[in-house]
From Swiss-Prot:
Gene3D superfamilies: 2.60.120.1560. Keywords: Cell membrane, Membrane, Signal, Transmembrane, Transmembrane helix. It is found in: Cell membrane. It is a single-pass membrane protein. It comes from the Eukaryota. GO terms for cellular component: cell periphery; plasma membrane. This is Uncharacterized membrane protein YFL051C. The keyword S-adenosyl-L-methionine does not apply. Residues 1-23 form the signal peptide. Residues 24-132 are cytoplasmic. Residues 156-160 are extracellular. Its main location: membrane. The lineage of its organism: Eukaryota, Fungi, Dikarya, Ascomycota, Saccharomycotina.
Length: 160
């Protein structure tokens, strides 16, 4: 009686594992048509906060409880490089835009409050407006970026 019981137990464990494996792979299948590039959402983040991003809950889901600033889609170049450009030549492009204009178009227009980007003004606790993050006009110094999509690895002319 112990052998049939062992066989039954082993079979039960196998079926349970197979069911769990099938359920976990089915849950991750895409539901929409495939599109090139990633979708990127931007959420508020407190400027100067150097601890919240270390919390697993924040990185896992809590960031989405903050204000969503906007989104872009179809992004295929996912490199992020940003640093406040600090120059001493007083031209339009060397001024940090500190206030976003409602029409969001002319960064050197009269509706902006600007501050010269000299070394003394390159404070990490100052929000500099820029469109350096995937063309989205925001403050790269205090924003959380969420990227979603599927990566199809390309090798030459073949996709894997």
């Amino acid at each position: 009686m112990s052998i049939p019981h062992s066989v039954f137990s082993a079979l039960l464990v196998f079926v349970a594992l197979a069911t769990t494996t099938l359920a976990s792979t089915e849950a991750c299948l895409p539901t929409n048509k495939r599109e090139d590039g990633m979708n990127i959402n931007f959420y508020e983040y407190t400027i100067g906060d150097q601890t919240t991003y270390l919390e697993p809950e924040y990185m896992g889901y809590e960031y989405s409880n903050t204000k969503k600033l906007g989104s872009v889609s179809g992004q295929t170049n996912l490199s992020i490089y940003y640093s406040p450009p600090c120059e001493s030549t007083p031209t339009c492009v060397t001024y940090a835009v500190l206030k976003r204009d409602e029409d969001g178009y002319d960064p050197c227009g009269p509706l902006y409050e600007t501050k010269k980007r000299d070394t003394e003004y390159c404070d990490p606790n100052t929000a500099y407006w820029s469109s350096d993050l995937f063309g989205f006009y925001t403050t790269p110094t205090n924003v959380t970026v969420e990227m979603t999509g599927y990566l199809i690895w390309s090798m030459g002319n073949r996709r894997r």
